Regions:
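Short, acidic/turn-prone active-site loops that include or flank metal/cofactor-
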Residues: 36, 59, 143
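Glycine-rich FAD pyrophosphate-binding loop
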Residues: 7-9, 23-45
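Short, glycine/charged-enriched secondary-structure capping and boundary segments
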Residues: 22, 44-48, 125-129
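Alpha/beta-hydrolase active-site loop signature
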Residues: 36, 49, 119
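FAD-binding core/adjacent interface of flavoenzyme oxidoreductases
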Residues: 1-9, 25, 80-147
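Glycine-rich Rossmann-fold phosphate-binding loop(s) that bind the pyrophosphate
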Residues: 10-14
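N-terminal Rossmann-like dinucleotide/flavin-binding domain of flavoprotein oxidoreductases
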Residues: 43-105
Length: 147
């Protein structure tokens, strides 16, 4: 079981900003996210889309925002557990216990749920044998806009 000061569920912009704010106060955190990389929807669904509602930043893309947030939290040496889905959250007398689908268990007195709109998955084609083409000629997300 991994122990920390705060467990953050969600590695999107809010989860990453929470790491920063906790780090400033000297608190360590662990971040858990269902996606394979930090950034949430900003990086997964619209990395090139302009974002206009960040205070003091007139415009940036989802990818730029994610890169800046990750750069900002580097000094705090945060441990990320990506490709992990939270299966159970329970509280004992003084701590939260979080269990994931990868059988990892985390213990902390504080928890932040920064899941945005929640875990999302593509609506896959209901075509026979479509899964045989996933990742080669059938894609559900843009991973490289140059391809």
């Amino acid at each position: 079981m991994k122990k920390t000061d705060t467990i953050i569920i969600g590695a999107g912009p809010v989860g990453l900003f929470a790491v920063h704010q906790l780090g400033i106060k000297g608190l360590k955190s662990i971040v858990i996210d269902n996606l394979d990389k930090a950034g949430g929807q900003c990086i997964e669904l619209y990395p090139d889309k302009p974002i206009y509602d960040i205070p003091a930043v007139p415009e940036c893309t989802g990818e730029e925002l994610t890169k800046k947030l990750l750069e900002q939290i580097k000094p705090f040496n945060t441990e990320f557990f990506l490709n992990e889905r939270v299966e159970e959250v329970k509280q004992d007398k003084e701590n939260w216990i979080v269990k994931t689908n990868n059988k990892n268990e985390f213990l902390a007195p504080n928890i932040i749920i920064a899941g945005g709109v929640g875990s999302f998955e593509p609506r896959k084609l209901s075509v026979k044998e479509a899964e045989n083409f996933e990742g080669t000629s059938l894609f559900y997300a843009v991973r490289n806009k140059e391809q």
